């Protein structure tokens, strides 16, 4: 009997592993389709030091097709900005991406702020009950990929998904919300979230929300000021010297 149960358990484990692999493979395939024709060749690069925080960083100016023209970070020190990016937007864009560099360098600090200030948690793996249809169509974001799954108040999960299994670009996406308590999937943030955060230009992940608040001055004023206070106190050189 025990031997029989052991065999059944082994089969279940194999089925779960295959299922998990299939989900990730499908998401990988869809993201590859969305990025078809993308080239991220480096055309020019400059290395700088941020006068406010003191961090060293590198800007790589790349092909306009890289991530379909979306600026992004690739590691703790490097941001990629397409050469076609509007020059008048470059200063704010660099500030935005510098926040992502700091998020990569000091993940524990940012996660603590998200939990304390916003009741958010982020994690590397999806929750057990997240629908397969969302996981298979999930859009990968280089700036959030270390821990892409986000939950607000232990219940609501936001995720960027492609609108089809054959997307023409990274722009063919929408933000959907999954309610872990009820299982409902909606295209709008829960009313409680909207009451708390107000209008957010990028609501898929706290990393993007934080970068928008600090660099772009977006979002709820009170929340933005609270975040700016802890951010400046912790990262500004003038407050550390």
Predicted feature descriptions by range:
Residues 115-241:
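Metalloprotease/metallohydrolase-associated module, dominated by Zn2+-dependent proteases
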Residues 62-95, 99, 104:
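Active-site scaffold of zinc-dependent metalloenzymes
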Residues 98-116:
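Catalytic Zn2+-binding segment of zinc metalloproteases
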Residues 26-78:
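Auxiliary, metal-adjacent structural segments of Zn-dependent hydrolase domains
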Residues 40, 88-89, 93, 201-205:
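Soluble non-cytosolic domains of exported or imported proteins
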Residues 1-20:
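Single-pass alpha-helical membrane anchors
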Residues 58-60, 103, 108, 233:
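Non-catalytic terminal regions of proteins
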Residues 59-68, 111-127:
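Acidic helix-start/capping segments at beta-turn-to-alpha-helix junctions
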């Amino acid at each position: 009997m025990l031997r029989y149960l052991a065999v059944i358990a082994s089969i279940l484990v194999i089925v779960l592993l295959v299922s998990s692999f299939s989900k990730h493979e499908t998401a990988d395939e869809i993201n590859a389709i969305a990025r078809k024709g993308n080239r991220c060749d480096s055309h020019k690069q400059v290395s700088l030091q941020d006068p406010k925080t003191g961090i060293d960083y590198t800007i790589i100016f790349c092909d306009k097709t890289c991530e379909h023209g979306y600026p992004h970070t690739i590691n703790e020190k490097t941001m990629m900005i397409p050469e076609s990016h509007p020059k008048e937007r470059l200063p704010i864009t660099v500030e935005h991406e510098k926040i992502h560099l700091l998020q990569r360098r000091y993940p524990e600090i940012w996660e603590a702020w998200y939990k304390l200030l916003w009741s958010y948690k982020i994690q590397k793996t999806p929750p057990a009950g997240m629908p397969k249809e969302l996981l298979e169509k999930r859009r990968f974001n280089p700036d959030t990929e270390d821990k892409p799954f986000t939950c607000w108040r232990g219940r609501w999960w936001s995720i960027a998904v492609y609108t089809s299994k054959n997307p023409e670009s990274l722009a063919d996406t929408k933000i959907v919300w999954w309610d872990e308590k009820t299982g409902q999937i909606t295209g709008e943030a829960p009313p409680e979230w909207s009451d708390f955060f107000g209008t957010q230009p990028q609501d898929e992940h706290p990393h993007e929300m934080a970068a928008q608040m600090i660099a772009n001055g977006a979002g709820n004023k009170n929340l933005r000021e609270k975040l700016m206070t802890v951010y400046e106190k912790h990262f500004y050189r003038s407050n550390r010297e």
